[in-house]
């Protein structure tokens, strides 16, 4: 067999091959649009030249503190400039950024710090109580840097002598950072919600982050210089990679410390916000704003919404208010959104019920994803594309995680058969669009955050008066879903709903506490298995 001429003497070399990374997006934006506003935070403004310089200073300062390739830098930050800077400054050293969910409780944060072997922690003073409590519990003893927000001062305790702005000032503005030697190198670490025990550490690589950044711009319709409002927490899947996406098109980041109606309307009106993302809580907050909180919106604002699909009434109200909606679906393991409900123009000719049905579907694969399907998890065969046969939603491609940190067994299980197993059950239609039907792990998605029903049930079961309990999702216009607990009490014992809720508040992060407690017989099969599908129907009327 003669050699393939296209393989002869045509080799990869530095001239024709460089590892993909989102880091060079910022370098280019600073070169081409040095004076364009990159970040707005209160009265603070940073141009792209300043943004790039601050990231280089951060990288330099971290290097001076001993941070290098393969080290983990953890952050407990709100959607503020340091969070954006960490997305570039940390990986500029070959280090890995670990963003911590500020809504977690201290034991989970301590576990993450230990599991990640965190070498340095940047913490906002708003979250000082959480960080301090976690550090007491953790074996890891990272160096600490405090962020004192000059725009929204916080009264939390300062945990170290190192102030973030002083750290930035100490860095070299001309620091020569390095491209990753391999695009497969880790760039960030995100933890799952820990639905079956301790959370798993999801590792992203430079290649996936770069491709996801491009894909976001395509799917969100972002042209040059969009204005993006940070209603989505950047600790969640690295803000779906939008911290990097905006540098591709030299967009403006509008930081939002708290998701509040007045601040959102002011940002949209004053800064000309063109795009924002988030869970249904963002939409309900906008819609439920008082007249005093509202501002007229005279331009198109595109909203990417994910998590549990909001009620049709919310979608209709958002559209009537002038927002353009796009439904997305994904997981921590897929860098955030991996499917998009691409709207076809012919659907506009459907009646209201038909259009509503189309909106409930999770959609087709993201442009950066190589394959999306629904398989029978036992046979690994594709289910019929009939919109009725249920299987497991599975993904394949470059925006699937590298794997789970220090968990070879879980990684192998997740990738069994050459597909990433989502754990979500759904159907696929003849046009290739998928729709979720259930979550095999009974995850409750509230305000964009995953809540394990098992974790909540475990806490309730520990109450001495509880005989049986089950926790399911109850639809909620504001949060998307909230936990609803069904409880059977032990004979001759009593407990009120308020008592059980107080019990939960002492043992769970606040957002995980059920909003409703229903005292009723918990339906079970003949073998004793709780029938959660029945409870979900009951919860709708609870």
Model-derived segments and spans:
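Conserved AMP-binding/adenylation subdomain of ANL enzymes
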Residues: 210-227, 235-275, 289-290
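Conserved AMP-binding/adenylate-forming
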Residues: 269, 301-303, 310-328, 332-434, ...
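AMP-binding/adenylate-forming catalytic core of the ANL superfamily
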Residues: 104, 111, 121-125, 276, ...
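Structural core segment of the AMP-binding/adenylate-forming
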Residues: 64-65, 92-169, 491-493
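Conserved structural elements of the adenylate-forming
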Residues: 52-60, 169-174, 188, 202-223, ...
């Amino acid at each position: 067999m003669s050699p393939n001429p296209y393989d002869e003497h045509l080799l990869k070399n530095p001239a024709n091959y460089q590892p993909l990374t989102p880091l060079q997006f910022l370098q280019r934006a600073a070169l081409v649009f040095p004076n364009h506003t990159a970040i707005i935070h209160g009265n603070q403004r940073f141009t792209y030249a300043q943004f790039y310089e601050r990231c280089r200073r951060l990288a330099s300062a971290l290097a001076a503190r001993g941070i290098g390739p393969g080290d983990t830098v953890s952050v407990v930050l709100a959607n503020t400039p340091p969070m954006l800077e960490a997305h570039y400054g940390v990986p500029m050293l070959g280090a890995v950024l670990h963003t911590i969910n500020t809504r977690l409780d201290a034991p989970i944060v301590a576990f993450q710090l230990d599991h990640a072997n965190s070498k340095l922690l940047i913490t906002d003073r708003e979250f000082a109580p959480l960080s301090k409590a976690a550090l007491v519990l953790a074996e890891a003893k990272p160096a600490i840097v405090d962020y004192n927000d000059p725009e929204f001062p916080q009264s939390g305790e300062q945990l170290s002598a190192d102030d973030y702005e002083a750290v930035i000032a100490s860095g070299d503005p001309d620091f020569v950072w390095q491209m990753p030697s391999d695009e497969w190198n880790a760039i960030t670490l995100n933890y799952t919600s820990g639905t079956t025990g301790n959370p798993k550490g999801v590792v992203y690589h430079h290649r996936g982050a770069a491709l996801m950044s491009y894909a976001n711009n395509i799917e969100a319709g972002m042209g040059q210089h969009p204005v993006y409002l940070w209603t989505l927490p950047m600790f969640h899947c690295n803000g779906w990679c939008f911290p990097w996406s905006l540098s591709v098109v030299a967009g403006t980041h509008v930081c939002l410390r708290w998701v509040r109606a007045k601040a959102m309307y002011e940002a949209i009106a004053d800064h000309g916000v063109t795009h924002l993302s988030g869970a249904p809580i963002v939409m309900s907050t906008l819609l439920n704003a008082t007249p005093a909180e509202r501002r007229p919106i005279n331009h198109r604002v595109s909203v990417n919404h994910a998590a549990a699909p909001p009620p049709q009434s919310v979608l209709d109200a958002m559209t009537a208010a002038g927002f353009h909606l796009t439904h997305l679906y994904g997981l921590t393991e897929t860098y955030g959104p991996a499917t998009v409900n691409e709207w076809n123009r012919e659907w506009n000719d459907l009646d209201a019920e038909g259009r509503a049905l189309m909106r409930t579907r999770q959609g087709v694969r993201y442009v950066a994803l190589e394959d999306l399907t629904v398989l029978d998890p036992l046979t690994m065969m594709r289910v019929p594309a009939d919109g009725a046969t249920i299987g497991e939603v599975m993904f394949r491609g470059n925006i699937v995680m590298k794997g789970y940190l220090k968990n070879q067994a879980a990684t192998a299980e997740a990738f069994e058969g050459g597909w990433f197993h989502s754990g979500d059950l759904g159907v696929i239609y003849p046009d290739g669009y998928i729709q979720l039907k259930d979550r095999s792990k009974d995850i409750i998605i509230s305000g964009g955050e995953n809540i394990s029903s098992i974790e909540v049930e475990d806490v309730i079961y520990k109450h001495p008066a509880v005989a049986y309990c089950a926790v399911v999702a109850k639809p909620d216009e504001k949060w998307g879903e909230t936990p609803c607990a069904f409880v059977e009490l032990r004979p001759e014992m009593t407990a009120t709903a308020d008592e059980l809720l107080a019990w939960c508040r002492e043992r769970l992060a606040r957002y995980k506490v059920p909003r409703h407690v229903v005292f009723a017989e918990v339906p079970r099969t003949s073998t004793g298995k709780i029938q959660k599908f029945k409870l979900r129907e009951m919860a709708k009327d609870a």
